Amino acid sequence: MNDLMTKSFMSYVDLKKAAMKDMEAGPDFDLEMASTKADKMDENLSSFLEEAEYVKAEMGLISETLARIEQYHEESKGVHKAESVKSLRNKISNEIVSGLRKAKSIKSKLEEMDKANKEIKRLSGTPVYRSRTAVTNGLRKKLKEVMMEFQGLRQKMMSEYKETVERRYFTVTGEHANDEMIEKIITDNAGGEEFLTRAIQEHGKGKVLETVVEIQDRYDAAKEIEKSLLELHQVFLDMAVMVESQGEQMDEIEHHVINASHYVADGANELKTAKSHQRNSRKWMCIGIIVLLLIILIVVIPIITSFSSS
């Protein structure tokens, strides 16, 4: 059963064996009843694993979606035309929408699996429940990895957006912008009165306006993407709460399993000690009887001999 706790996914046969082993270890094990329960396990475990594989596949697709978002983001850093920036922004937005749809589907499926697990616990008892919950917990751990991957990408995109604005500022003015100026350009809808006035005086209105339009497009893209990413992030956060909650339940289950194994081990040791005491008691009893017989013989034989002589 400990193996079940440490593996994310197990085959159907392994799950069934683990659950059957738990039932056989129970105090009220009945062969006929176990056979009936095994038939029920055949039904619910096979369909359950199909659902688990579906969730696992969807999480794989989300990882692929994140990889494409990162690819489009890297491409956007090398383009300057408004049309190209807009095209890549649309691609990123579409990927985010797709990822959001998959994340919501996974969240819904995990909630359904949780409800089914609780029902299984009520109807079939803890062995099958622990088997199913262990697999569900493995899915959540995988989901948590995807969530951390997404969070890293989100932070990277917003950080590099500021770096892009800084580079464009340097291209126009020949100077490096400090954090305050970058924030001003971004929050003022790419205006930044000081930046615009100085740049127009030094480089002409046409070139500056072209750069400002590019920064504006990047700003619009960044805000739109950030809004979508925040929505996706909220879904991940909701599922993270589910991960922690189920993780605590799994820790409690594992704690009980470990305690049970300790109790069994302690009981076996106590039984072994009791048997040892019993053997020692019998040994000393035999020795006592033998000594008593020897004493009787030592006392009785001389008496008999004296009577015979007289």
Curated annotation (Swiss-Prot):
S-adenosyl-L-methionine recorded as keyword: no
CDD domains for the chain: SNARE_syntaxin1-like, SynN
N-acetylmethionine PTM positions: M1
All ranges on the Cytoplasmic side of the membrane: 1-283
Coiled coil: 94-159
Tissue and organ distribution: Abundant in flowers and developing siliques. A low level expression is seen in the seedlings, roots, and leaves.
Its membrane topology: Single-pass type IV membrane protein
Domain of life (superkingdom): Eukaryota
Ranges annotated as spanning the membrane: 284-304
Residue ranges annotated as Vesicular topological domain: 305-310
Induction text: At or soon after the onset of mitosis.
One GO BP: intracellular protein transport
t-SNARE coiled-coil homology domain boundaries: 212-274
GO molecular function, one term: SNAP receptor activity
Listed PROSITE patterns: SYNTAXIN, T_SNARE
This protein's GO CC annotations: cell plate; endomembrane system; phragmoplast; plasma membrane; plasmodesma
Keywords: Acetylation, Cell cycle, Cell division, Coiled coil, Membrane, Protein transport, Transmembrane, Transmembrane helix, Transport
Main location: membrane
Subcellular location, record wording: Membrane
Function of the molecule: Involved in cytokinesis. Acts as a cell plate-specific syntaxin, required for the fusion of vesicles at the plane of cell division.
Subunit structure: Interacts with SNAP33 and/or NPSN11 to form a t-SNARE complex and with KEULE.
PANTHER family associated with the record: SYNTAXIN, SYNTAXIN-RELATED PROTEIN KNOLLE
Family: Belongs to the syntaxin family.
Protein name according to UniProt: Syntaxin-related protein KNOLLE
Source organism of this protein record: Arabidopsis thaliana (Mouse-ear cress)
Gene: KN
